[in-house]
């Protein structure tokens, strides 16, 4: 009994000793493993690198935030005039100071053609030119008031309109050393519209030209080639000053031109257009180039309805550039285009770039000779852009060749790689996965574009006029949020595998861009390649996605087989590059902490993982050079794409967003542009959309909600972004009734007009009649008659007399001479309403009138000005310099076959544009009190522009 107990106790002790020994061994092994893990623990730099560039939600979200911040900042720096440096050289400082003073004098008052202010500006420029060229014997000037300053031409073909114009351009010629070299024209216009002080349009251009003239006169050194400066008049209503220059003897001296213009109010002067690549490439020689051929494409496609003198010079066979201010358009042609709204930096940007361009070309002895060596290349339209004062340009044919190469090479390379990886089962993509991304995008676009955008439009129709970027940010956030939700849903229901998403999206995006590039390339191959000259961004976007696709497919193709990349149950799916899941976690915990936790909890699984097939290990080692490929693909595709899309979208929106006030068609275009820009901004992020962390999702929700609230409460018009209304006071010659007409989009003018004192006091009803394209004409009878001619009755503002006639038999050619007297009016129009009039004469007398059959077709001059067109002339516009002289007109006309009487009936319409006060018997009157009233009593969110070439129009019906 005792022995048995002793043996049992000994066994227990031995077992306890064994357990203690085993525990000690396990403890030693644990310590060894812990020490081994500590030795294998990556360095701090490695851990930071893995934390930042590992495919984690937080890393990706930080990348997205950094990308947006960087792109917006770079775009602001690139487009803002604030980053233009003032000159530091004393001579340039003096040039700027003198030019700024000149601009202040020019912009002292409104100065439309035919006004006293216009005459004052003309006289100032004449004196200033004479001052600047004193002592420079190689510089001469000409006042275009000579025997040949008057002419007639066809100004419109539909309907047929003939214009008569008297020019008083101021011209300067800087004689070049080499008369064989083609000369350069520098042009701007010194007139304004009646409602504007003309600072940006086009005082900046005029002041810049004076600065350049100042520079050359101080140099006392002749340039190699001749430079002609055209300070022209009456650009605003027909580009007439530029047209007049084409008839001046100095026109034959020049072949190239630089036109200075302004369609905004300040900012930076952008290269709008270039006639060809051969001249555009010389813009790289300016110090702060700012350019985009997007605007050139807009002009070529008729999206920009206003024109500049560039059009006249190009049609006259010249080659050159159009340099202009383009924003903000709110102040364009309004009283806000004044000195207060611009800056010396804006002036210096135009002046310095113009000076650099002209100075370089004037010294270049080869310029003009090289242009003829490769005419087919150099005369093609140019594609151009700038970034941070670097200028890039290429011809459309060169871009066409590059695009053809891109369209061919990448599809072959990526297509072969894609075919290889799929057929060898290295990368398996199901049909549902392949269509899931396009389906998700289409569903997202439908939800956002047709529900969100349309609801915004119904709540705040004109908000894009003042807040285009608010709408872009809101729509983009909602798009990205909805798309991400749809992707998560697809992944949840196993429609698409997460490991397929990124590369699959990149491949499909590259295909979408390929289709767009094919369309662009087809357009570049035609004769109208300028209509696609702003689509160069598509080439870049396709290249970025194609390169990323190539790298991703290479990563898959280097693996032996897709099955070797399967991992143990319970592990995360590896990246496309095969890197272990611990460096590609979807959660936001520290990688190394989680790694240690896994070793303690799943040691067996870790050992199992390390002993996986040699093929898998070899595949990992093979593609290890592609580690963290998500970050490489992101950096290739996203930042540059986002910047190009955002910056291009910003430029276009800033240029056209105000046009939705001008027509329903323009409104549709602006809204389409808004969602196109928003969708385009989302496209580069599609491959990574499912990896945004919860904080990024909250930010998107916040932007979407806040933006939607702002859309509902923010006013579309304010002081900085006013509603632009157009004014015209009409006088009916039948009853001499005066009425004010205001033109605007439907529903915008009535509330403003109802608050005018004259309307409230008279209880006049405002009548609005619908016009084409969403516009309306709101009018009311005004008690504030114009006082342009104090002491005159309204019925005497126009006098039309028939000074003689030479009637022939019925259906023969009739001849009538009439005299039109409209004091202080320098512009009248005759509206015939049909094609009865076959020839018009300005300045003729009945006695010297030649027979109709002896008149040559078109324009001719023989003491008088003749224009003949047997197909019929519908309108005749007349412009004269002397406001007190009359228009002497002769008409050759045929009665209609159904006319019962041999009578010609037409309307004479004369315009007055001068707002200068007038006096009678020591009493001062406002010339146009009705216009002063609308300016004074309108809300601060309203600005006023002219509707026609004058602010007052008097119409009288005439029978001869």
Curated annotation (Swiss-Prot):
Pfam families: Peptidase_M28, PFF1_C, PFF1_TM
EC identifiers of the protein: 3.4.-.-
Similarity comment: Belongs to the peptidase M28 family.
Glycosylation positions in this chain: 148, 657, 736, 763, 803, 875, 921
Binding residue positions for Zn(2+) 2: 201, 236, 333
Cytoplasmic side: 1-57, 423-432, 498-502, 557-635, 690-696
One Gene Ontology cellular component: vacuolar membrane
Ranges that cross the membrane: 58-78, 402-422, 433-453, 477-497, 503-523, 536-556, 636-656, 669-689, 697-717
Primary localization class, coarse: membrane
Function: May be involved in vacuolar sorting and osmoregulation.
InterPro entries: Fxna-like_M28_dom (IPR048024), M28_fam (IPR045175), Peptidase_M28 (IPR007484), PFF1_C (IPR053975), PFF1_TM (IPR053976)
Co-factor remark: Binds 2 Zn(2+) ions per subunit.
Native source species: Lodderomyces elongisporus (strain ATCC 11503 / CBS 2605 / JCM 1781 / NBRC 1676 / NRRL YB-4239)
Origin superkingdom: Eukaryota
Binding sites annotated in the UniProt record for Zn(2+) 1: 189, 201, 261
Basic and acidic residues bias: start-end ranges: 587-605
Protein name per UniProt: Vacuolar membrane protease
Cofactor(s) in the UniProt record: Zn(2+)
Compositional bias annotation for Low complexity: 24-33
Keywords: Glycoprotein, Hydrolase, Membrane, Metal-binding, Metalloprotease, Protease, Transmembrane, Transmembrane helix, Vacuole, Zinc
Subcellular location: Vacuole membrane
GO BP annotations listed: proteolysis
